[in-house]
Amino acid sequence: MRRNVYLWLIAVAASLLMACEKGNQGPVGPDPSTIVDGMPKSAKRGVAFSFTNMLDLPLLSPYISWDYNWGNTPTDDAALWFDSNEMDYCPMCWNGNYNADKIRAFVAAHPNTQYLLAFNEPNLTDQAHMTPREAAALWQPLVDLAKELNLKLVSPAMNYGTLPGYSDPIKWLDEFFALPEVDPNDIYAISIHCYMSSASAVQGYIERFEKYGKPIWLTEFCAWDPVPGSVSTQMDYMCTVLHDLETRPSVERYAWFIPRSGSKVDSPPYMQLITHDYPPALTDLGRIYCLLSPMNSKLWLRANRPVYASEYCALKNNALSLRPTTDEEVRNRIGKDGLQVANFSQGQELTYRLYLQEKASTVELRYCGYSNSICEVLVDGQTACHVEMPRTGGSDNWTAAHQALSMDAGAHTITLRLFSGSCSLSAFQVK
């Protein structure tokens, strides 16, 4: 009996020693594969664009996941770039005059192709221009092609229309789905277009299509009706709408219209993402589209650098204005481009997921503004400290405010809640 007790004590001591050795290796935390130095690009975000200038692709491909160009195939050079840069190209049958053999050849050469897009705006007289019955008469060959190539079929892309009797896209789709030639089960997702300039109107428009119980693809959108008065208005629209699209479960994909058009970048409706220069560059609007947070709530940012204010995983109010940062000190410290929060106002909350390798004792906020402000810092939902931020006297007069706090090593959520005042916020760091 004594021998058994003795052996048991040895086993317990050994297990405790092993636990201590493990503890010395660092904080116990989440799966290491979920700890990242920067958030990956959004799986939802894409563009509606024909990449004929190969200089455009390196600008957008690090930040977007898919593209379509209203055609059956992209250019050969673009297709190769997509394959090597984690971008998905979606062939489209714009109307009934598509080339099935070209689509077959493309899918054979690019077997990772997943989707086939159907007719473009059939209820517009200057687009595919089809009644539901006319579209249904052309539907079965499209279904057969998708099944042959093992592609998921996306519905005709709907918008408010000009076809007599079918200005309402819901009416067109309801009639289309009710026809005997059409089996709704053959359709994987619902494609829609929207150019309303009100973010709340866009949200309400999306909700109308949720009744079909299928993933929604917003395959063309920007603020255009009414035409925005400035690029700043387009930027604010983009921020609010993208925050909703990234967090709305029913939306699986979205594509901005359009990265570059034939008009000047600084002309209405101010929606271009890429300049007309040689070589081209991202416009400020393009930088926002590329860098806006994917709102990832599963990954943890490694807290070994300042965190851009825009790297949040959640926020209280979607109407948050972001702009390319003008805080050169932060950009140099982080080593990459980023966005600043231009309207951090009282009551707004920004939440981040951070992983600390070591215990932290200080929080630093980089800010500027015309009023005195106080920011409440919450760690894992509990108030850790309040940071006083005296006014800096200018919109680009960046400075740092510091406050002591205590954070153990490991994974934490940090929420910045503006308790009073208003300011611009470029970044923060716990150290």
Describe the predicted segments one by one:
Residues 110-132, 153-163, 185-194, 252-260:
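Active-site groove signature of glycoside hydrolases
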Residues 1-18:
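Sec-dependent bacterial lipoprotein signal peptides
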Residues 16-39:
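Bacterial Sec-dependent N-terminal signal peptides
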Residues 69, 91, 120, 170-208, ...:
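Aromatic- and acid-rich polysaccharide-binding/catalytic face
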Residues 44-114:
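N-terminal carbohydrate-binding/catalytic regions of secreted carbohydrate-active enzymes
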Residues 90, 248, 257-306:
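Aromatic-rich peripheral "rim/lid" segments of glycoside hydrolase catalytic domains that contact
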Residues 297-431:
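Extracytoplasmic
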